[in-house]
């Protein structure tokens, strides 16, 4: 199976509790935990970063489709959060609410909902994921 990214995303952490530096092909991102659990809140936490990936992918996918259709929808907003149920096995639910700056028809709404579900990160999160870790 071929890697999707040309270069690995890399991360490091030093002695400062929870502060991580994440590097990708063209930059760096600080990740941290909120102060209420011992971090300094200097960057997004891992859950926020995961949701940001889904937000960015959803917005970009919708923008491509809207532009291709020539629809007058200049701005799209998205809000995401997640919840977890740990009763028998871990179950995570992500809520994603999309709003538009213009009124859209019911037909557009139905189509854009389908397109949002087809964004690559949404499809990735809904399918089987294997994580192989080595030391």
Model-derived features: positions:
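Extended beta-strand/beta-hairpin segments
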Residues: 1-52, 63-135
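Alpha-helical metal-binding/catalytic segments enriched in His/Glu/Asp
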Residues: 57-58
């Amino acid at each position: 199976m071929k890697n999707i990214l040309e270069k690995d995303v890399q991360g490091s952490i030093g002695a400062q509790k929870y502060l991580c530096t994440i590097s990708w092909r063209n930059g760096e991102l600080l990740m941290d935990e909120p102060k209420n659990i011992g971090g300094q809140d200097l960057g997004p936490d891992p859950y926020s970063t995961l949701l940001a990936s889904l937000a960015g992918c959803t917005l970009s996918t919708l923008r491509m489709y809207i532009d291709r259709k020539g629809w007058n929808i200049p701005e799209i907003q998205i809000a995401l959060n997640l919840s977890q149920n740990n009763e028998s096995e871990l179950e995570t639910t992500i809520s994603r609410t999309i709003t538009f700056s213009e009124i859209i028809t019911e037909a557009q709404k139905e189509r854009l909902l389908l397109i949002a579900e087809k964004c690559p990160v949404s499809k990735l999160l809904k399918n089987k994921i294997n994580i192989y870790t080595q030391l």
